[in-house]
């Protein structure tokens, strides 16, 4: 296309000799320029996504629908204040309850159970105040823009407009990308930028782009070490299939990226747990399910918890998860159908490239299988939704799965097949957008309304709780944490023991449970055995004051 435009520029005339309007010619050049397509596609997605994040959460959110987001935000605030990701534990805590969910008590303080890179980076950014908070919101938006632009670079110039559909076609990944306080969001942002840099390497041949792609993957792997082995294997296989002659440079860059990811976590593990090879999440798993036998190879237990944190599911569990999250979750079946495009794409490659890419596809399938479990949020529900845990774990797979149908359409020369495939991809993208904006309990509209509602409720509840008091709650820590000290309710007997110990230490205690669940009723019964009662403070909201009755 660029050649056609430049040939017209030399004479200033069109094909029949008439003078060409200079303004029209400049417009034609701009409209056909591949670089302009990249900028346009990226700018549109960046503006849409940044607006969505700011509309949903605001610039400095403290109310979240998920405790995972609250963990990262809380730890970031502590780091911003210079005290590290630690909460003081005022009492012995054998039940491991004197902290919010997804934290763990280590001695006289508690720390998050997540890999530390995400909340350390967030904490350092929040030290920049408004600028840092804007960057946290803008980074995932930039990732979406980079993914769309990277897809465009993989497409022929005449069909780069197809890249406009790529983020929406991977709608579960888009949903989790735009929840910036989830620790999956920086991983997906890193993958998106890696796709852009990798595509730039393939288009320009400059090895610096490959180094940048693997640096991005190294950051993503540092944020989520449980994805690291899969990310590096995929990067190695895709890169070797694309340019086998550069195998030495590829191996070296992948190894350097792995060292970068590993070093960051080893250093922060030592700061948090005191042991470089002992991560907080591994300690939490050991405490919940029992420690694994000692291994002669240091770090082997941690490696297993990273590769297969939940083991391999049974056929019944795996098939049910496949039905929910690959067949019936909105228009997701169209994304699965689009993988048929892998067949013609692979047939065009050399035998060596087909073997390497086939191995990469097998690794992606194994990864997806290892994350399909019913002992997760949404596992007990008969339907699939993007806000469930399994789609969150599978977001890198959804992201990469959006590429084959678009790459096939970019190369397809059959007019009817191109039109039919284009209609299916447009339907997938449109259906995905509808899921993200209209689906109950998972749309950005729902998240926006939740933040507004709970922010108002937080102001009202916080006025009824004295400063310094602790509040036991089963699930409401995700929006209470910023105004009150929150501890958690789990097993009723153990929670009653913890409350009794804290009450005997003369601490001012409250229980917050909006609904009288079976767990709450059992807790009341256990407290009664210990001469502890709950006095209603705000019956409408479920706030109770703990009262230690005289014997």
Task: Describe the predicted segments one by one.
Residues 147-172, 188-189, 204-212, 418:
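Transmembrane-helix signature of polytopic, membrane-embedded enzymes
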Residues 184, 229, 379-412:
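Hydrophobic/aromatic-rich transmembrane helices and adjacent perimembrane loops
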Residues 142-149, 236, 240, 320-364, ...:
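Hydrophobic, aromatic-rich transmembrane alpha-helices
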Residues 34-42, 158, 215, 236, ...:
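Signature aromatic-anchored transmembrane alpha helix within multi-pass, membrane-resident enzymes
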Residues 94-101, 266, 270-345, 380, ...:
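Membrane-lumen/periplasm interface segments of multi-pass, membrane-embedded glycan/lipid transferases
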Residues 58, 73, 77-118, 122-125, ...:
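Interfacial juxtamembrane loops and adjacent helix segments
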Residues 67, 135-141, 161-169, 173-193, ...:
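Multi-pass, polyprenyl lipid-linked donor-dependent membrane glycosyltransferases
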Residues 426-479:
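Membrane-embedded, lumen/periplasm-facing catalytic core of multi-pass transferases
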């Amino acid at each position: 296309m660029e050649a056609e435009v430049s040939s017209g520029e030399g004479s200033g005339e069109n094909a029949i000799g008439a003078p060409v309007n200079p303004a029209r010619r400049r417009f034609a050049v701009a409209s056909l320029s591949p670089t302009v397509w990249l900028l346009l596609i990226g700018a549109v997605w960046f503006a849409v996504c940044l607006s969505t994040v700011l509309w949903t959460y605001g610039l400095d959110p403290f109310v979240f629908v998920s405790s995972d987001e609250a963990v990262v935000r809380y730890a970031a605030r502590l780091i911003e204040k210079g005290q590290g990701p630690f909460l003081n534990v005022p009492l012995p805590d054998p039940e491991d309850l004197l902290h919010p969910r997804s934290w763990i008590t280590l001695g006289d303080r508690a720390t998050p159970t997540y890999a530390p890179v995400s909340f350390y980076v967030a904490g350092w950014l929040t030290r920049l105040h408004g600028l840092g908070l804007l960057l946290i919101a803008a980074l995932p938006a930039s990732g979406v823009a980079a993914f769309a632009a990277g897809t465009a670079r993989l497409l022929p110039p005449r069909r780069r407009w197809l890249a406009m559909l790529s983020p929406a076609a991977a709608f579960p990944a888009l949903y989790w990308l735009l929840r910036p306080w989830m620790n999956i969001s920086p991983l997906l942002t890193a993958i998106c930028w890696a796709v852009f840099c990798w595509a730039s390497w393939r288009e320009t041949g400059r090895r610096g782009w490959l180094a940048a792609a693997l640096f991005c993957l190294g950051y993503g792997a540092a944020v989520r070490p449980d994805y690291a082995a899969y990310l590096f294997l995929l990067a190695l296989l895709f890169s070797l299939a694309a340019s086998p002659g550069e195998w030495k440079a590829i191996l070296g860059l992948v190894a350097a990226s792995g060292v970068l990811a590993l070093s960051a976590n080893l250093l922060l593990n030592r700061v948090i747990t005191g042991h470089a090879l002992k991560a907080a999440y591994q300690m939490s798993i050991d405490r919940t399910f029992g420690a694994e036998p000692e291994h002669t190879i240091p770090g082997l237990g941690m490696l297993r918890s990273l590769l297969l944190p939940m083991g391999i599911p049974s056929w019944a569990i795996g098939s049910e998860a496949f039905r929910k999250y690959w067949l019936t979750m909105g228009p997701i079946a169209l994304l699965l159908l689009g993988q048929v495009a892998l067949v013609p794409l692979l047939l065009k490659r050399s035998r060596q490239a087909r073997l390497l890419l086939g191995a990469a596809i097998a690794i992606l399938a194994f990864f997806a299988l290892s994350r399909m479990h019913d002992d997760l949020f949404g596992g007990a529900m008969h339907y699939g939704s993007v806000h469930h845990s399994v789609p969150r774990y599978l977001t890198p797979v959804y992201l990469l799965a959006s590429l084959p149908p678009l790459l096939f359409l970019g190369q397809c020369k059959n007019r009817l097949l191109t039109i039919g495939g284009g209609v299916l991809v447009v339907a997938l993208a449109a259906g995905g957008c509808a899921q993200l904006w209209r689906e109950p309990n998972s749309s950005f509209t729902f998240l926006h309304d939740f933040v507004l509602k709970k922010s108002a409720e937080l102001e009202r509840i916080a006025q009824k709780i004295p400063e310094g008091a602790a509040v036991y709650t089963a699930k409401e820590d995700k929006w209470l944490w910023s105004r009150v000290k929150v501890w958690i309710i789990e097993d009723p007997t153990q929670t009653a023991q913890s409350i009794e110990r804290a009450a005997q230490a003369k601490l001012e205690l409250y229980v917050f449970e909006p609904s009288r669940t079976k767990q709450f009723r059992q807790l009341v019964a256990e407290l009664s055995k210990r001469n502890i009662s709950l006095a209603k403070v705000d019956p409408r909201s479920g706030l109770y004051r703990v009262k230690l009755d005289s014997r």
